[in-house]
């Protein structure tokens, strides 16, 4: 008799496939960037209140940003009473979670190749394979306002959404981008901060 000792479906990375369970013992972790596929700063998991949540787990701060933390669970249409902590996507485009969160894809009902991915920018998106164009298209996403995603532009920065071109990050006056094309590192001062413990500086 054959016994399964290990299977990849039990250990998702940043993506769930149809019928693959997300449970209390698993989570999705975003990649670092579009080209760097090491673990990033965003996680999708069930929190201690049994709610499916998105977490920004940055180098200096950690915070849940979805559902909106200022809402109580019933305002966000979530239930905390079911502690089974299971979520699953089916091949028709229906996602269902034990906290009562559910959604249907824009193309619900069609049998397509699908994947639910926690992207590097902290947004969850459902992708459907469009056979004619031979490409993945977004058929649902959790956050329509990318600037509400925690840490998306890093520290000391501003986030602005431009219709047609998407999210734009910029540094605060007196700051510069810290690391190349990766905005998640944020911005650093263009001026030198004093290292002498007897000196002080006052910033407006």
Show the residue positions of the predicted features.
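Beta-rich ligand-binding surfaces for carbohydrates and other polyanions
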Residues: 1-204
């Amino acid at each position: 008799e054959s016994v399964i000792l290990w299977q990849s479906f039990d250990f998702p990375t940043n993506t769930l496939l149809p019928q693959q369970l997300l449970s209390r013992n698993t989570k999705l972790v975003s990649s670092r960037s579009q080209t760097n596929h090491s673990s990033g700063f965003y996680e999708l998991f069930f929190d201690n209140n049994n709610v499916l949540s998105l977490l920004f787990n940055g180098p200096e701060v950690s915070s849940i940003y979805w559902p909106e933390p200022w809402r109580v669970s019933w305002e966000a249409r979530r239930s905390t009473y079911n502690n089974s902590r299971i979520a699953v996507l089916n091949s028709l485009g229906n996602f269902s979670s034990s906290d009562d969160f559910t959604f249907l894809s824009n193309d619900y009902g069609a049998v397509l190749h699908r994947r639910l991915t926690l992207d590097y920018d902290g947004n969850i998106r459902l992708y459907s394979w469009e056979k004619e164009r031979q490409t993945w298209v977004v058929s649902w996403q959790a956050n329509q306002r990318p600037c509400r995603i925690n840490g998306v532009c890093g520290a000391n920065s501003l986030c602005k959404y431009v219709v047609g071109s998407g999210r734009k990050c910029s540094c605060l006056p007196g700051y510069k981008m810290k690391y190349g094309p990766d905005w998640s590192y944020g911005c650093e001062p263009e001026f030198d901060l004093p290292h002498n413990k007897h000196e002080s500086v006052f910033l407006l």
